Regions:
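Non-catalytic C-terminal accessory region of glycerolipid acyltransferases
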Residues: 1-10, 14, 102-223
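A transmembrane-helix-recognition feature enriched in membrane-embedded lipid enzymes
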Residues: 2-36, 59, 80-89
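Short, basic, glycine/proline-bearing loop/turn elements
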Residues: 21-22, 88-94, 121-125
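Hydrophobic residues at beta-strand termini and immediately following loops
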Residues: 34, 71, 92-94, 152, ...
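Short amphipathic alpha-helix with an adjacent loop that forms part of the alpha/beta core around
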Residues: 36-40, 108-109
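Catalytic core of membrane glycerolipid acyltransferases/transacylases, capturing the structured
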Residues: 39-98
Length: 223
């Protein structure tokens, strides 16, 4: 048994093993579903999702059919063995007091190499089960790299493991919905500031539309 979407040769062996084990966990306990893989984007891109839970990063990773990259607190790399492990599954250290510029440069480098970077543009886990205001930096990243954003809606994690819960429920239902990529070329005619603002607004609308699509029964074309 394996995810139907898992390709034969787009993941290194360790990453693939971790992804499969995690997918199995979410499939058994949370009946995890994936929608919108017809919106798969070739080349460097940000995959930008709502953020309600510690479960969101693994759900995003198991739902996308190729390797993705995360930014992680530098302190997590201090242990030799754990640090080696999370590096092997594509986590990149960022200092707790790192400037936005250092984070920006790390993401730009990954995108320029044609990689997918998983991010949560709210900047933190939400307090309520709704999308918080997005940080403006995501528009700047796309304007700088001329790449794309794939909007993502993650369902179910707020109820299972939100900020008020010390431990997750071992039941529930999760889903991950990928939307139509947001392309730089559609904003290239605007001046830089306008483009950044419009990209951020478009992403916010897209994530909310994906949620609406899912909650209305997950039927019809995915926006």
């Amino acid at each position: 048994m394996k995810p139907a979407w898992m390709p034969p040769n787009k993941m290194n062996m360790l990453y693939r093993t971790v992804i499969f084990s995690t997918w199995l966990f979410f499939k058994i306990f949370y009946r995890h579903r994936v929608y919108g893989l017809e919106h798969y984007y070739t080349g460097g891109a940000l995959l930008a999702a709502n953020h309600a839970s510690y479960y969101d990063p693994p759900i995003l990773a198991i739902s996308w059919p190729e390797e993705g990259h995360f930014l992680a607190r530098e302190g997590l790399f201090k242990n030799r063995w754990f640090g080696a492990f999370i590096r092997a599954v594509n986590s990149h250290p960022v200092s707790g007091d790192a400037s936005d510029i250092s984070v920006f440069k790390t993401i730009c480098k990954l995108l320029s190499e044609g990689k997918k970077v998983f991010i949560f543009p709210e900047g933190k886990r939400c307090h309520k089960d709704e999308l918080d205001k997005l940080k403006p930096g995501i528009g700047m990243l796309i304007a700088r790299t001329k790449t794309a954003i794939v909007p993502v809606y993650i369902h179910g994690t707020f109820d299972i493991w939100n900020r008020r819960r010390k431990f997750p429920k071992l039941w529930g239902k999760t889903a991950c919905v990928f939307g139509t990529p947001i392309l730089w070329k559609d904003f290239a005619h605007l001046d830089k500031k306008q483009a950044q603002e419009q990209i951020t607004l478009k992403l916010e609308r897209s994530i909310n539309e994906l949620r609406h699509w899912y909650e209305k029964g997950a039927k019809g074309p995915i926006p």
